[in-house]
A protein has these predicted regions:
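ABC ATPase NBD Q-loop/coupling interface
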Residues: 65-80, 295-318
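H-loop/switch region of ABC-family ATPase nucleotide-binding domains
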Residues: 198-200, 420-421
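Hydrophobic anchor residue at the start of the ABC signature
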Residues: 153, 374
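ABC-family nucleotide-binding domains
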Residues: 174, 395
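Conserved ABC ATPase "signature" region
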Residues: 117-135, 341-356
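Conserved ABC ATPase signature
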Residues: 139-143, 147, 360-364, 368
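Catalytic Walker B motif of ABC-type/P-loop ATPase nucleotide-binding domains
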Residues: 164-168, 385-388
Length: 452
């Protein structure tokens, strides 16, 4: 009996005009399956059928057959499926329950009634598999986005599910974190767990995958696991203004969340027409630096200087910025606040969002939400743009739109600082690379070397 079996499966979200899944036929019974496809193709929707969130939480109209671990998903309560189906969401920030790392990993085991001794062993094993034993006593609120992704996987692995479902698990991870997560995933599969992984950075997963599936238009077709990897984008044409002025400066800045310093005595500056890429391991202080430049996190010592003008800040979790009924009204709201002319249609086209302009941002895929939030913060031509992991959940077309947007910002005399683990983005747009580590900053050049 296949672990996962879908036949003529179709699904439509509440009030949606078209199907998100449109006749999926699929059987999988072992190993690691990689699920690829453009943003909005139906990947997250298909994954949410696996643990019963569709239809039991999201509602909507579902038809056909969906069986997981020999259970009828349409008729089986989500709580029953959760015992055997481990799920890691696109937004790990929303998955943590307890304020401490160790307690959060133990949460699922507590619900299963696992004995304390066995619980402690499983928690320790899961932390070790994900390479986060050193975070055991940390508060969840102090973790970076990548560290939270590894925490979410540890909590799921501790429950030893029969089916592991991961939605963009590598989106915020540095190379070390990606290697640790893929190693943990491989160990779980070798131990008999079946895994279904949706991932845009598919080249990282391909060598370990037993099969590859492509989603398009709500349907699934096989693709070769050893198929071609999307080439790196060419270096964007970026003509900076002839004269560069100071955009922002940190003078002997020490900074960190909750009064705990993670950056020490930094002296950094950025000029107009410049795109600075911030690189470094998860937890190295990239988000702290962005928030300090933005004025959202006062420095513990030192001073911050900013050129007058509007600052646009995109956090790691784009959902924090999206509160209005449609994508268009999100952009219109920014334009009204900045007294800019109505460029909503142009911005929607530039970011590839015209087809979802009247959709609720909360109903979009992760990559589409990322683009919607980016369009909203860029509307009104800000003078300083600060982006935290902007390629999270983005497909190739969305990355190209982001690259073009950053080039436009620099070309009109603005400046940008981008925290990223994406070497392709660094190679495409960065005029300077600043690597963070051990609380200090190092400028890395040439760009080709920094992007490796």
């Amino acid at each position: 009996m296949p672990t996962l079996s879908f036949a003529r499966l179709h699904y439509t979200y509440p009030e949606a005009a078209s199907r998100a899944l449109d006749g999926v036929d699929l059987e999988i019974d072992f190993g690691l399956t990689l699920l690829t496809g453009a943003s909005g193709s139906g990947k997250s929707t298909l994954l949410r059928v696996c643990n019963g969130l569709i239809p039991h939480f999201h509602g909507g109209v579902i038809g056909g057959s969906a069986r997981v671990l020999d259970r009828d998903v349409i008729r089986t309560p989500t709580r029953e499926l959760a015992r055997d189906v481990g799920f890691v969401f696109q937004d790990p920030e929303l998955q943590a329950v307890y304020p401490s790392v160790e307690r959060d990993v133990a949460f699922g085991l507590e619900n299963l009634g696992v004995a304390r001794g066995e619980m402690l062993r499983r928690v320790g094993d899961a932390l070790e598999m994900c390479g986060i034993v050193h975070l055991r006593s940390r508060a969840v609120g102090t973790l970076s986005g990548g560290e939270r992704q590894r925490l979410a996987l540890a909590g799921v692995l501790a429950m030893r599910p029969r089916l592991l479902v991961l939605d963009e698990p590598l989106s915020q991870l540095d190379p070390e974190g990606s290697a640790a997560l893929l190693g943990a995933l491989h160990a779980a599969v070798q131990g008999g767990t079946m895994a279904l992984v949706a991932e845009h950075r598919h080249h990282l997963v391909l060598e370990r995958a037993d099969r590859c599936l492509l989603m398009a238009g709500g349907r699934v077709t096989p693709c070769a696991p050893d198929g071609p990897v999307q080439p790196a984008p060419a270096r964007a044409s970026q003509d900076a203004p002839a004269s560069s002025e100071l955009s922002w400066r940190l003078h002997q800045v020490t900074a960190g969340p909750a009064g705990v310093a993670v950056l020490h005595d930094l002296d950094l500056a950025g000029g107009t027409g410049e795109v600075v890429a911030l690189t470094g391991a998860n937890g190295s202080g990239k988000t702290t630096l962005l928030r300090t430049i933005a004025g959202l996190l006062p420095p513990l010592a030192g001073s911050v200087e900013r050129r007058p003008g509007r600052i646009a800040y995109l956090p790691q979790n784009p959902s924090a910025l999206l509160h209005r009924a449609t994508v268009r009204t999100e952009i219109d709201w920014t334009l009204r606040r900045t007294h800019a002319a109505g460029r909503a249609d142009a911005m929607l086209e530039e970011m590839g969002l015209a087809a979802v302009a009247e959709r609720d941002p909360r109903d979009l895929s992760s990559g589409q939400r990322q683009r919607a939030a980016l369009a909203a913060v860029l509307a009104g031509s800000p003078s300083l743009v600060l982006l935290d992991e902007p390629t999270r959940g983005m497909d190739g077309a969305a990355r190209a739109a982001l690259t073009a947007a950053l080039v436009r910002v620099a070309g009109r005399g603005g400046s940008a600082v981008v925290a990223t683990h994406d070497p392709q983005l660094v190679a495409a747009v960065a005029t300077r690379v600043v690597e963070l580590g051990d609380g200090v900053a190092r400028v890395r050049q040439p760009l080709a070397e920094a992007a490796r």
